């Protein structure tokens, strides 16, 4: 399930679409001047297109995870991308509980688990073994023999008697073979399992984990907030146009340019409503009950395999 965007409290970026991307727009800059916290998730919506978006930047949140473990570069990159993705997906559902991404691999990375609560507090860990080349692909990391398992779990904060967490299985391949990266995996899942056209851009390094999500709004034609009707073909054209703008994003740009500047460059001539950002944070409140629940979520087979692999 997805949630509607809250009432706008920010500024507007107005204009017409062109294929170029110049630097700044004063109205949006005025809104962001009050947003000094780096660890934030920003929601936005296009007035002239049936599209909503989110942009997340994890800095201190991400570094708090890295301070606790020394991961090889490919593991760090995948873990950071999973954290950014978990924040984006959590902000996109109406749910009081935790969204958990669980990746159990058959390669050098045996397990990655990321948990994001409804208030965007997060924690994450990974288990790996052996030497891992810096250029290792997703398949080489977790799906060498095609036996990897990836799941999205929604674990309610308050459970009714007998209620079990919802879990969706996420394929790592499509009809053409293994999917190349985490963004492609989640896009494929959202399209085929949730029937939602979704695009994701993810990146991480030693200091930042960032991501952007664009999602086509369900329903028939109509300009957001105006009641004006459009043909489905117009909606599809607008969706494709916004995605083309997103495709101009480069990994280095996502990791080096602040959220304000990046959104201005991408959508400088679109009419975009910007909403009050939400703050992310690292939080690990381990307790006997929480550890027990985590082990139950992993399943007996996975827990026993960890013991079997101990020297």
Question: Positions of the model-derived regions?
Answer:
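N-terminal mitochondrial targeting presequence
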Residues: 1-34
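Interaction interfaces in information-processing and related assembly proteins
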Residues: 31-276
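Cys/His-clustered metal-coordination modules, chiefly Zn-binding fingers
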Residues: 249-311
